[in-house]
């Protein structure tokens, strides 16, 4: 059980103000009585690329300027999860991990180009077998037709922000990003409309499991018309690392990672938002200094991003109101999360994929009035592969042994198992595709992070053939939570790095990701591991 916050100075004070005396730890046992508890309804709301820094309950630099009162409400009436992490920070693989409770190397979805095996015994099917009426609405992004759901109405591929197409059950399925019928309106509103419509028409004799998945705030950050003037007169606070990165890297100064500045000429925000055709309008940087250009590109990016978040928060409120109006709130688990995090200018980056904190961390708030006390804060290390086992345990059904995740139901009720994980394994496979981020894997503990950038495509679908120089990064998260100082070469930390390398190999073996199928990577490991 972890009893501190990573961003102690800001987050602890904010949580103390909001949650009172309950904000200093994983709060004690729930006083709710689960005896004779009927199966809970479950609403799993997931957005796309929603950074913790863009949810006000987390107390970031954006909290006051861009509040999210409805998402915050879930936390205030339930639990705020501080240490939830993705196992492969990219849309399709993360969604597959959530459904299967497995890492990419087991579920077979390594990259955006891989098809999800819809014959697998995933969360939707298991909830059906447990007696639930099941539905998924919104972003699916797994290529193959949804299975395990009594109803689906999903976006083709990434989908559109305005007047989106949706593919409804009962009509011939067309692969991935093909097919669908147009629904007039803004996508976040439409997805909520269709989610509520299903709730109204569901089988009332069964508990329900609804996955309501939003496209926003994924790029290209097209906001609703009603939000076009939101934040116009505001100055968005900038992370210090937007301009200065200390000893972060070493690739920060090179052509890697999509940048806010023009540092990476292959993909950067400054070029995107100054060229004709950008969907939310362009900015004029003529005559500006380099720093002014970066500032302007950052302001444009984050304002558009936060405008899409505003619509999400409004629609979360609509779901909560529906539950209240229909007297369903008490016995309904409501979860809000994202498929991964997002960099909002930190280290001069946008996008996800990296093992850095802003990409690795997933927001998560959970409310279940029947069993979870309000105003809780949980600091246990939870992974996206834990979501399915947790929901299955709440549903009162068996968790398949093939799932690599573990239920954190008892953690939510204030009783963290003594053998709960204190470290996690991460791997990004889609080498150099789209945002020019090398293939890498690593280990994160409560205090440290070790990353090996191996820089090889390994014949993965969609990975680029460009080979990058292998290198290591090591961060002391307790003393350097912003990851500004790569201490891999620091003599003081060599014993810790050595121990982490051993633990990393143990995790890879346990998780069936040994690299033995990739002789070129094994050769690289033999050369660069010590």
Which residues does each PLM region occupy?
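Positively charged n-region of N-terminal signal peptides that target proteins for export
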Residues: 1-7
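Residues forming the ATP-binding cleft of Hanks-type serine/threonine protein kinase domains
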Residues: 478
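Extracellular ligand-binding/catalytic regions of CAZymes and related secreted enzymes
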Residues: 519
């Amino acid at each position: 059980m972890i009893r501190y916050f990573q961003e102690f100075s800001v987050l602890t004070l904010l949580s103390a103000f909001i949650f009172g005396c309950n904000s200093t730890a994983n709060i004690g046992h729930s006083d709710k009585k689960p005896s004779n508890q009927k199966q809970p309804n479950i609403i799993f709301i997931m957005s796309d690329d929603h950074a913790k820094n863009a949810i006000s309950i987390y107390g970031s630099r954006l909290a006051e300027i861009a509040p999210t009162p409805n998402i915050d409400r879930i936390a205030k009436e339930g639990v705020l999860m501080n240490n939830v992490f993705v196992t492969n920070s990219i849309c399709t693989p993360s969604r597959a991990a959530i459904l299967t409770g497995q890492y990419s190397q087991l579920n077979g979805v390594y990259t955006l180009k891989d098809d999800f095996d819809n014959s697998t015994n995933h969360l939707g099917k298991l909830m059906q077998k447990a007696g639930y009426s099941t539905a998924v609405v919104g972003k699916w992004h797994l290529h193959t037709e949804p299975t395990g759901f009594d109803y689906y109405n999903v976006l083709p591929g990434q989908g559109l922000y305005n007047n989106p197409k949706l593919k409804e059950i009962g009509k011939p399925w067309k692969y991935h990003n093909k097919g669908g019928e147009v629904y007039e309106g803004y996508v976040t509103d439409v997805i909520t409309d269709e989610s509520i419509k299903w709730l109204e028409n569901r089988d009332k004799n069964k508990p329900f499991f609804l996955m309501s998945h939003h496209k926003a705030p994924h790029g290209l950050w097209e906001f609703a018309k009603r939000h076009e003037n939101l934040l116009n007169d505001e100055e968005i606070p900038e992370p210090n690392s937007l301009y200065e990165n200390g000893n972060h890297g070493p690739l920060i100064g090179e052509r890697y990672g999509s940048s806010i500045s023009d540092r990476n000429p292959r993909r950067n925000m400054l070029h995107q938002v100054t060229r004709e055709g950008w969907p939310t309008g362009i900015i004029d940087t003529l005559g500006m200094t380099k720093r002014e250009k970066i500032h302007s590109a950052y302001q444009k990016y984050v304002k558009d991003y936060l405008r899409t978040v505003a619509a999400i928060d409004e629609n979360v409120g609509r779901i909560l109101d529906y539950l209240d109006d229909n007297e369903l709130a008490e016995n309904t688990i409501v979860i809000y999360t994202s498929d991964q995090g997002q960099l909002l200018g930190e280290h001069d980056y946008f996008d996800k994929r990296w093992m850095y904190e802003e990409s690795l961390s997933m927001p998560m708030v959970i409310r279940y009035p029947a069993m979870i006390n309000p105003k809780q804060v949980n600091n246990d290390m939870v992974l996206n592969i834990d979501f399915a086992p947790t929901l299955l345990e709440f549903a009162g059904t068996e968790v398949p042994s093939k799932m690599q995740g573990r239920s954190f139901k008892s953690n939510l009720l204030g009783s963290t198992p003594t053998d709960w994980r204190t470290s996690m394994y991460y791997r990004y496979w889609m080498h150099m595709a789209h945002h020019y981020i090398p293939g890498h894997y690593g280990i994160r503990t409560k205090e440290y992070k070790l990353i090996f950038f191996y820089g090889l495509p390994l014949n993965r679908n969609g990975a680029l053939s460009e080979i990058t120089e292998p290198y290591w990064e090591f961060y002391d998260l307790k003393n350097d939570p912003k990851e500004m100082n790569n201490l891999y070469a620091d003599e003081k930390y060599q014993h810790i790095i050595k121990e982490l390398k051993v633990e990393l190999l143990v995790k890879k073996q346990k998780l069936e990701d040994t690299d033995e199928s990739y002789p070129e990577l094994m050769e690289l490991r033999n050369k660069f591991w010590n």
